């Protein structure tokens, strides 16, 4: 479906879009505090894959979102003294990332602006805009049992005509070693980075309920 470029520009810079942009620009810019890592952060995935490959951690990385608590549990038993070079740098980045993301009791705001001349319909693992222009804002809060992640996106001239989108919004609750979540969560299944034949992020997330383990440690019995 082709769009008139002049109409697209006028739509993106409409008074409503400008008002939302100015309003969100007044919000402090910080990252979210979330116990689940959604697909999109290519550097985090590369660091985790490297640490997996050299035997520092042992966590499944083929079904996203992944549990950061699982990564933390594996990382805290690692012997960092034997690391050097790229492995040491990856270890430090992941450790700092976990310290920030798993901090509890603090509400955090975030704001993003993305523009793309030719949005990709076939998307890879890396987070990319689905439309020609997007303004995104969110609020997240985490404690020892519950998580709330609110996200709203205004899209310029979207393909499906839905200008306001709740993609990324979800609420969750820890139930023992399980995390129960409900909302619009991005999912990625498979080892690929340029695409997934199982489940990828080409389509926008649909509302659903997800139950996954917080820690991937093996069961104590064979049953």
Residue ranges and their predicted role:
Residues 32-57, 76-112:
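N-terminal propeptides
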Residues 1-15:
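N-terminal secretory signal peptides that target proteins for export/translocation
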Residues 26-28:
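N-terminal signal peptide c-region/cleavage motif recognized by signal peptidases
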Residues 109-117, 150-154, 182-186:
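Transmembrane beta-barrel strands of outer-membrane/channel proteins
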């Amino acid at each position: 479906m082709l769009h008139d470029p002049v109409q697209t520009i006028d739509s993106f810079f409409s008074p409503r879009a400008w008002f939302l942009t100015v309003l969100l620009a007044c919000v402090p810019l910080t990252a979210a505090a979330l116990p689940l890592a959604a697909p999109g952060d290519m550097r985090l995935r590369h660091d985790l894959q490297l640490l997996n490959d050299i035997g520092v951690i042992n966590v499944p990385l083929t079904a996203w979102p992944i549990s950061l608590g699982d990564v933390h549990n594996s990382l805290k038993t690692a012997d960092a003294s034997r690391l050097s070079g790229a492995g040491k740098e990856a270890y430090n980045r992941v450790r700092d990332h976990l310290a920030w993301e798993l901090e509890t009791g603090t509400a955090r705001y975030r704001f993003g602006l993305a523009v793309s001349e030719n949005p990709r319909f076939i998307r890879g693992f890396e987070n990319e805009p689905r439309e020609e222009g997007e303004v995104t804002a969110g609020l997240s809060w985490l404690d020892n049992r519950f998580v709330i992640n609110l996200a709203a996106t205004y899209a310029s001239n979207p393909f499906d005509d839905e200008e306001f989108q709740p993609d990324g919004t979800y609420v969750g609750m820890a139930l023992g070693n399980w995390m129960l979540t409900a909302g619009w969560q991005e999912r990625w299944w498979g080892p690929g980075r340029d695409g997934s034949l199982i489940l990828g992020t080409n389509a926008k997330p649909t509302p659903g309920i997800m139950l996954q383990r917080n820690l991937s440690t093996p069961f104590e019995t064979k049953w």
